[in-house]
Amino acid sequence: MLQRDYIQRLIREFMAALERMLEKKEVEERREKIRELYNQYVGPYAFYSIATIEDVMKAMAGIADEEKRLSKMDMLAELYYNEADTVGQPTRDELLNKAFMLFDYVEAHGDTFSIERRNKMAEIKQKIGDALK
């Protein structure tokens, strides 16, 4: 029970930090804040920024607690999704693809329904369509 409360508090804290980052207008400020969020909530930006989806899934598989793993995957998907707005092609599509794959995994394996997640997945499909792997 304590662990579940901790994970929920961590997610709320992450979402609040993400909201504050989105308020920033300057792209460089947003990128720097995104790097900080990676390092604070998910793991090293140096790894996750260049990792393939296969590498990400392997890294996440190392987290034994399923609820914690799904929460981290959801946070990482949010970071990829938001970071895509700060970069150009082809990096944008790569980030959106990784975000979609993570959202899809969380949707399939998690027990929390999220209309927001589904809307983001639909938006990603619209943006990159056939480029989804």
Q: Which residues does each PLM region occupy?
A:
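Non-transmembrane amphipathic alpha-helical segments
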Residues: A17, A77-Y80, L102-F103, I124
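Short coil/turn connectors between adjacent alpha-helices in alpha-solenoid helical repeat scaffolds
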Residues: L22-K33, E83-L95
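Amphipathic alpha-helical binding modules
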Residues: Q89-K133
